[in-house]
């Protein structure tokens, strides 16, 4: 069974994390497969837009695989953390625009993965959060930086310090997700947005992505 699946139609590729029995939690194998998948997509000029989601209806991704983490050595833990950071960076920097279709829990590394996407559409059943402090660690896959950029420093501190989960509607209110839709129509709505983006100039969209990402901390003369 492939841990990450892809399906491409009309220039739109849907990438699914395929561990529904583990709430799509990411062990080292899943993380490495995601990196490989997005590196390959970055080279594919036939793909215009990428949708990232999780298999099943319960979870986009519950984040790092805690059971896996409990069984590995300290050196392996460091390597795993670096792999997780590389996952989110690879997703963020892929040339195509990305849409996270959040179909349930997006916690810890799962929330960080969603934040690495350009646009986030959440099912009304989704729950998001950075609960790492509840097990004695800080968010380690770029969550502190990306969350602050998306929702602002005060709200980011609240979410990280408390470790609480928030519902999809609250996530939309604070700007963490762009849209909230019924679970049954999540994939359809993500596809509609992907089609709208794909209908535009590929070069124009990709150059805009680079400009926006690089311009977050730049002045207008850069």
Language model region names:
Residues 87-93, 101, 107-161, 174, ...:
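CoA-thioester-processing core
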Residues 1-53, 75, 89:
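Conserved CoA-thioester-binding segment of acyl-CoA-metabolizing enzymes
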Residues 3, 54-90, 106, 136, ...:
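Glycine- (often His-adjacent) and acidic-residue-rich active-site loop
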Residues 15, 19, 33-34, 52, ...:
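Terminal peptide-recognition signature
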Residues 164-170:
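Acidic, divalent-metal-coordinating active-site segment for phosphoryl/phosphodiester hydrolysis
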Residues 121-126, 177-222:
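C-terminal long alpha-helix characteristic of the crotonase
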């Amino acid at each position: 069974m492939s841990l990450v699946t892809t399906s491409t139609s009309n220039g739109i590729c849907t990438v699914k994390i395929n561990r529904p029995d583990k709430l799509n939690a990411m062990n080292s194998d899943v993380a490495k497969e995601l990196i490989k998948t997005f590196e390959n997509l970055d080279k594919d000029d036939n793909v215009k837009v990428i949708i990232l989601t999780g298999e099943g209806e319960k979870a986009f991704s519950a984040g790092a695989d805690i059971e896996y983490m409990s069984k590995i050595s300290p050196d392996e833990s460091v390597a795993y953390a670096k792999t997780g950071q590389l996952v989110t960076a690879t997703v963020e920097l892929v040339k195509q625009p990305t849409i996270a279709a959040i179909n349930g829990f997006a916690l810890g590394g799962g929330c960080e993965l969603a934040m690495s996407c350009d646009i986030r559409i959440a099912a009304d059943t989704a729950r998001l959060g950075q609960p790492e402090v509840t097990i004695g660690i800080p968010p380690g896959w770029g969550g502190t930086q990306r969350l602050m950029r998306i929702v602002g420093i005060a709200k980011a501190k609240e979410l990280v310090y408390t470790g609480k989960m928030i519902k999809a509607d609250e996530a939309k209110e604070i700007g963490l997700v762009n849209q909230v839709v019924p679970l049954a129509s999540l994939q359809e709505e993500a596809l509609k947005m992907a089609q709208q983006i794909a209908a535009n100039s590929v070069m124009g969209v990709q150059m805009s992505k680079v400009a926006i990402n690089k311009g977050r901390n730049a002045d207008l003369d850069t």
